């Protein structure tokens, strides 16, 4: 999905990489950068970076159900931080749980590449879809 990596300035600035996309699912990677640190003495990434990745991944997963001219916008988001995210790449995986005509509900899981089976955060994203009519 070149749109995600190349055509959205914020995504390009963050360096987000699409690893896998299929209907109702997305897996994105956020390469580690020192400026993503939240607490350098603890070696932990900033929670806002984790939330940003969750939001983007959730939107991408939902967007797979719609056309290229439809717009997906987050209206509600909850992120539970389960443990500190170490200084390493983050991997986000999003699964669409409900895809309606105008609303989507997505579950997102974030892990570090150093321990891919252990979530550092989980969240729920609710999005509004504005369909191109």
Feature map (PLM): residue ranges:
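Catalytic strand-loop segment that frames the active site of acyl-thioester-processing enzymes
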Residues: 15-44
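HotDog/MaoC-like acyl-thioester-processing domains
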Residues: 85-87, 91, 95-133
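Compact, glycine-rich, soluble single-domain proteins
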Residues: 42-55, 59
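Hydrophobic beta-strand-centered segment that forms part of the acyl-chain substrate-binding groove
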Residues: 59-91, 96
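A generic structural signal for short beta-strands and their flanking turns/coil linkers
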Residues: 12-14, 24-26, 71-77, 88, ...
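Feature marks short, surface-exposed loop/turn motifs that line or immediately flank catalytic pockets
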Residues: 34-36, 60, 129-131
């Amino acid at each position: 999905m070149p749109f995600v990596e190349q055509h959205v300035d914020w995504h390009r600035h963050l360096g987000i990489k699409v690893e896998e996309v299929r209907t109702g699912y997305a897996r994105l990677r956020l390469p580690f950068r020192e400026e993503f640190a939240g607490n350098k003495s603890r070696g932990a990434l900033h929670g806002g970076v984790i939330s940003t990745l969750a939001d983007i991944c959730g939107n991408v997963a939902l967007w797979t159900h719609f056309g290229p001219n439809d717009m997906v916008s987050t209206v509600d988001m909850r992120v539970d931080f389960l443990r500190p995210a170490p200084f390493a790449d983050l991997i986000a995986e999003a699964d669409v749980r409900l895809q309606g005509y105008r609303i989507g509900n997505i579950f997102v899981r974030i892990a570090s590449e150093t321990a891919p089976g252990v979530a550092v955060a989980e969240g729920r994203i609710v999005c509004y879809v504005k369909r191109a009519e």
